[in-house]
Structure formats: structure tokens, C-alpha cells
Amino acid sequence: MSRVPSPPPPAEMSSGPVAESWCYTQIKVVKFSYMWTINNFSFCREEMGEVIKSSTFSSGANDKLKWCLRVNPKGLDEESKDYLSLYLLLVSCPKSEVRAKFKFSILNAKGEETKAMESQRAYRFVQGKDWGFKKFIRRDFLLDEANGLLPDDKLTLFCEVSVVQDSVNISGQNTMNMVKVPECRLADELGGLWENSRFTDCCLCVAGQEFQAHKAILAARSPVFSAMFEHEMEESKKNRVEIKDVEPDVFKEMMCFIYTGKASNLDKMADDLLAAADKYALERLKVMCEEALCSNLSVENAAEILILADLHSADQLKTQAVDFINYHASDVMETSGWKSMVVSHPHLVAEAYRSLASAQCPFLGPPRKRLKQS
């Protein structure tokens, strides 16, 4: 059994991208040859379809595939009666089928290959099946002594066979590109600074509770905090900020977002968090709250959400709320929230009516647009 060659190192294979792992597939092909000499060829019977077979042969003593060559000296049928037909026959096979390519040639008086013909692909052989050439060589050309193909009236045929065996996969890792860059943990690490109150330089007071924070991070994330610390304001001088109109739990969630960009409890307090995000100019958090509120729009809360969106200039949420009210107009107008809005925010009622009147066709369903996050 021939040894499967090892794949070339990845760096030698190409100058293109280098994969972290690779697989090299070797399709094993067993090649062997066979020579068959027919003495006194001119005495072969000249009936069309007459068959001469060689003895059986194989690639080696342990190969259970047995082959033979088959010649029709005067062709196989009427179409090929002026030709010699030559075929490779699979005599015995332990498998259901094999695939093989073959090449036939004639050896002249000098032992040189001439008149070679070969298969263009690997053919499927089953036991008893043959493949070859019905018109391998013209009889008149073969029998013409001037061509030197029958020295001493001997026809010598040379056959090369390539049998396709099983494929072998070799896989491995590219040792040239094994550097693994760890995932960025910046959000977790900054979150740790907030949770553990390490290296803080300012105090935030919320409803009597004090929270230690970092001015640089607050200023980088919020234009409002940045203005407090940048100018000669009381907060900057005392490193102490009074946070008003924000509940402690909402404040904690806002601070978590400032440090990590995440707000795991957003769905539970989206309305209050929207107000805090608006107050401290946290635009991405604001849109995240809009998206959460939009997904929870209902007939009962549509009017309240519209008021909230208008109060905090949440334009995307406001558009979604108006569209929802238009689609469910008859039901929404029966709710206490709508009736209260008629009294407290008549301009929003007017906006909703204008939108409803300008609609060119009824909505096919409640809006489900995904909000854009800045």
C-alpha cells in the first residue's frame, strides 16, 4: 500500500488567507499496467463479433479485483466491422462497483507506444462490465506491414489501469496562526469599577443614598455630566452631585448603562428609564427604552405612552404610538387614558386625528418596525 503524502505546510500552499484549521483529502489511486501479445494475429478468425480474451490480471497478488482485455479483431458490429475493438473487462470484484480509468496502446517493433487511446474519465465498472473503444484502430492500417504494428505477425497491446480507491482525510491545526485574541471585556471591567466603587472621585446623591462614581466616565458618556464637571459649577467644586427626580433603582440601572452599555432590567422600568435617559442625554439608552415600550403597546396604555413619548421628545416611539392608535382607534378612544388625554393633552388628540384623516388606506396590522438606535 502506497503511503499517503503529507500536505504541504499552509504557508507554502498560497499567499492568501491562512485558516485556523485545515483538511487535506487524498483520493487513493492504484495504478498498474498489463501487456498482452497475440501471436499469428493475421490468422484470427475474421467473423464480425469474434472475441479473443487475455488471461486475467490484477494490480498485485493480494488484489481481489481481476481484469482481462477483450479484443474483437473484426469489430463488434456492422458499424465497427472495419476496425479492431478493444475493451477492459472486470472479471471479478468483491465490491458492488469500482471506478477506473484506462489507456490502451500498441507497441511497435521498437517497443514504442503508438496509437494510444485513453478514457476521459473514471468509468463505473461492475462485475462482468467492460469499457473500451469499438473503433480502436482501423484493420487495414493495422495489417499494413509498412506501419510496423505487427512485427512477426505479433500484436502487442499495452494497457494502463488506474483504479480509484477510498479517500483519506488528514486534518490539523495551523500552528502559524494559533494566537487567540481574547474577547473584549471592557464593559465587564468598567462595570466592576462601578460595582466595587474603586478609584472613585465623585459622589452622586439620590433620595438620601450616596453612590461613588468616576467623573471621567460620567463625562465621557453623558453631555449633561460633562457640562457639570467642565464648568465652574458647584458639582465640579465639591465633586458631589444631587440627582433629583430619579428613583434610586432607576438611577442604578442608568449608571449600569453608563458603565457597561447594558440595561438588564430595562423592561421593568422602561418608562422611568426613558425619562432619566432624556434628562442626561443618553441617546442610545433612550431609544432602547422606546423600543421596549413600543413592543408593549396595547389598547389600554397607548394614550399614556403617547403622552410619555411627547414629553421626552421620543420621536420614534411617538410615531409608533400614533400609528397604533389609528389602527385601534375605536377601542383606544373608549379607554380612561384616552379620555384623560383629551383633557390634559388636547394637542396630542389633534395630532392623532390629523394622522388618522391623512391615512390613504387602512393599516393591515399594528406597526412592528424596529426602532433605529444611534
From Swiss-Prot:
Homodimer. Part of cullin-RING-based BCR (BTB-CUL3-RBX1) E3 ubiquitin-protein ligase complexes that contain CUL3 and SPOP, plus a target protein. Pathway: Protein modification; protein ubiquitination. This is Speckle-type POZ protein A. It is found in: Nucleus; Nucleus speckle. Residues 297-355 are annotated as: Homodimerization. The BTB (POZ) domain mediates dimerization and interaction with CUL3. InterPro entries: BACK_BPM_SPOP, BTB/POZ_dom, MATH/TRAF_dom, SKP1/BTB/POZ_sf, SPOP_C, TRAF-like. Residues 173-297 form the BTB domain. GO terms for cellular component: Cul3-RING ubiquitin ligase complex; cytoplasm; nuclear speck; nucleus. GO terms for molecular function: ubiquitin protein ligase binding. GO terms for biological process: proteasome-mediated ubiquitin-dependent protein catabolic process; protein ubiquitination; regulation of proteolysis. Keywords: Nucleus, Ubl conjugation pathway. Component of a cullin-RING-based BCR (BTB-CUL3-RBX1) E3 ubiquitin-protein ligase complex that mediates the ubiquitination of target proteins, leading most often to their proteasomal degradation. It comes from Xenopus laevis (African clawed frog). Pfam families: BACK_BPM_SPOP, BTB, MATH_2. Residues 31-161 form the MATH domain. Residues 71-191 are annotated as: Required for nuclear localization. Belongs to the Tdpoz family.
